[in-house]
């Protein structure tokens, strides 16, 4: 089975996703991590496949919108019936969810926080409302998910 995952962070330095990808690879999955070219193209030396989405926008909301738009079409192209989609956090859940419905393939949601409660959103009510709306509309529809928490 193939697993497609994505992160808007720098995939060269994202330790959480690197651990997940290494574990999945160890258990025999064909893993591909999709990332973004936020500050140029990182030199990637990973034992699993990687793919970078060209990012033009750097402002926060435009960056998320562009990444999710391009991620949707990337997932559509790469996913098939032998694919499991692994969404990491709320910031990329929408394209994963849509592709899982279109292709009728499983989606797993990895959430390590309640995204709409991030401290960086406390003084940004409009942005917080967008994330809260996505949380309320998508998370209850996810059949498979996991989280790691101290609580």
Task: Cite the ranges covered by each PLM segment.
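Carbohydrate-associated surface elements
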Residues: 151
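A short, charged, and often flexible helix/loop element on the N-terminal side
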Residues: 48-74, 123-126
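Glycine-rich phosphate-binding loop signature in dinucleotide/nucleotide-binding domains
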Residues: 77-82
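Membrane-proximal helix-turn-helix segments that form the acceptor-binding/catalytic region
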Residues: 72-76, 94, 98-102, 109, ...
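N-terminal subdomain of nucleotide-sugar transferases
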Residues: 1-40, 144
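An aromatic- and histidine-rich active-site surface loop
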Residues: 14, 84-104, 108-117
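Short loop/helix-cap segments at secondary-structure boundaries that form the rim of catalytic
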Residues: 39-47
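Conserved acidic residues
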Residues: 83-84, 143
């Amino acid at each position: 089975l193939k697993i497609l995952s994505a992160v808007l962070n720098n995939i060269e330095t994202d330790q959480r996703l690197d651990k997940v990808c290494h574990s999945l690879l160890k258990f025999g999955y064909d893993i591909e991590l999709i990332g973004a070219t936020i500050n140029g193209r990182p030199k990637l030396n990973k034992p699993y496949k990687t793919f970078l989405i060209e990012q033009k926008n750097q402002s926060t909301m435009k960056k998320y919108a562009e990444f999710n738009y391009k991620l949707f079409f990337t997932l559509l192209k790469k996913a098939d019936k032998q694919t499991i989609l692994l969404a990491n956090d709320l910031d990329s859940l929408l394209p994963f969810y849509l592709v899982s419905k279109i292709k009728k393939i499983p989606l797993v949601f990895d959430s390590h926080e309640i995204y709409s409660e991030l401290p960086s959103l406390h003084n940004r009510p409009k942005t917080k409302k967008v994330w809260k709306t996505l949380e309320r509309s998508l998370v209850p529809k996810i059949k498979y998910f996991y989280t790691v928490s101290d609580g």
